[in-house]
């Protein structure tokens, strides 16, 4: 099971992110890995159903509200550029940067997108 965190825009306060849960495994085409690369396009239908397009495949999902939200933490250790207001270094601290309250679940197999198949005459 692959879990990917993406950011969604929100005005003021902490950022609110959405967790995407996919069944199976996603492999990068090249050995560079997936970090920092575009995975696909996320769209919503007029009914609010999430649709993920990855390459020549399409996945339909559903939005699930999490019972207990997740917090996204950033670890700051002494020696980092960020020190507290007095300029003194303290122990390791964690900064909450975002909350995850919802997830998008894609539990069905991806369907291939076929535009048109030419017929041989």
UniProtKB/Swiss-Prot annotation:
Binding partners and assembly: Component of the CTF18-RFC complex, which consists of CTF18, CTF8, DSCC1, RFC2, RFC3, RFC4 and RFC5. The CTF18-RFC complex does not interact with the Rad9/Rad1/Hus1 complex. The CTF18-RFC complex interacts with POLH. CTF18/CTF8/DSCC1 associate with PCNA. CTF8 exists as a dimer with DSCC1.
One biological process term in Gene Ontology: DNA replication
Domain of life: Eukaryota
Family: Belongs to the CTF8 family.
Matches recorded under InterPro entries: Ctf8 (IPR018607)
Record protein name field: Chromosome transmission fidelity protein 8 homolog
Keywords from the named record: Cell cycle, DNA replication, DNA-binding, Nucleus
Function: Chromosome cohesion factor involved in sister chromatid cohesion and fidelity of chromosome transmission. Component of one of the cell nuclear antigen loader complexes, CTF18-replication factor C (CTF18-RFC), which consists of CTF18, CTF8, DSCC1, RFC2, RFC3, RFC4 and RFC5. The CTF18-RFC complex binds to single-stranded and primed DNAs and has weak ATPase activity that is stimulated the presence of primed DNA, replication protein A (RPA) and proliferating cell nuclear antigen (PCNA). The CTF18-RFC complex catalyzes the ATP-dependent loading of PCNA onto primed and gapped DNA.
Record's signal peptide: none
GO molecular function list: DNA binding
Claim: Cell cycle is one of the keywords in the record: yes
UniProt source species: Homo sapiens (Human)
Compartments in which it is found: Nucleus
Disulfide bonds listed in the record: none
Gene responsible for this protein: CHTF8
Taxonomic placement: Eukaryota, Metazoa, Chordata, Craniata, Vertebrata
Gene Ontology CC entries for this record: Ctf18 RFC-like complex; nucleoplasm
